[in-house]
Each structure stands twice: as C-alpha cells, then as structure tokens.
Amino acid sequence: MPSFKLANYLRTHRKRLGLSQDEVTFLLGRQSTALVSVHEQFRRLPCLRTLLAYTVILQIPAHELFAGEYQKVEQVVSRRAKRLIERLATENPDQRTARKLAHLRTIVATPGTRV
C-alpha cells in the first residue's frame, strides 16, 4: 500500500524558510494573502504560473510541494498506461510501437519512484 502524502507542503516549506504568507504573497505579485491561504489549505490548486512561482520561491520541485496530488495523478496515469499497453500490444510490433511500449512500461513499473 502506498504511503499517504499530504495534499501539499506549501505551508511546511514556507514556515521552514521563515517566510510569512504576506511575504510569499508579495513575491507572487498578489495583493491579498487569501490566495496563499487557499492554496496552503488545499481548497484550490494554483494555476501553472503560480505553481512555478512557488517552486522558485520555495526552491522545491512541484511534485514535492504537491506530493499528495502528484501521487494521485501518478496512479491514474499508471492505470491508463496499463490500458494503453494492452491496446498497443495488439498492433504490429514495429519500432515506433516498441518505443511506446518501452516507455509506457517504465510508467507502470515503478509508481512512486519516478521524478
């Protein structure tokens, strides 16, 4: 059974660095700390630009900041990759299909250890 991950670690890393919500809000170019609070409480996912800004500010990769969400997405993609492997296995085994299958098998093989 996979270990449980928190939905996100924004607050953990922000506090570890000694940054206030107000300071992170300023670095994000926002006016109100409400957005940072909403993200820390995982009531809403940040947009891509804000996610990238968090990675710059906190110096932590996105998959670590949002470990729980990453884990969920990884599991879903792994299940889909298994289904795609089954579909592709019925095709002619040309070089292109072989490359696809090899890549898909790496997705399925070790969920939780990639990145």
What residue spans do the PLM features occupy?
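Residues in the recognition helix of alpha-helical DNA-binding motifs
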Residues: 13, 27, 38-39, 68
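Short, basic-rich loop-to-helix N-cap that marks the start of a DNA-contacting helix
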Residues: 18, 42-56, 72
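Recognition helix of helix-turn-helix/homeodomain-like DNA-binding domains
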Residues: 29-46
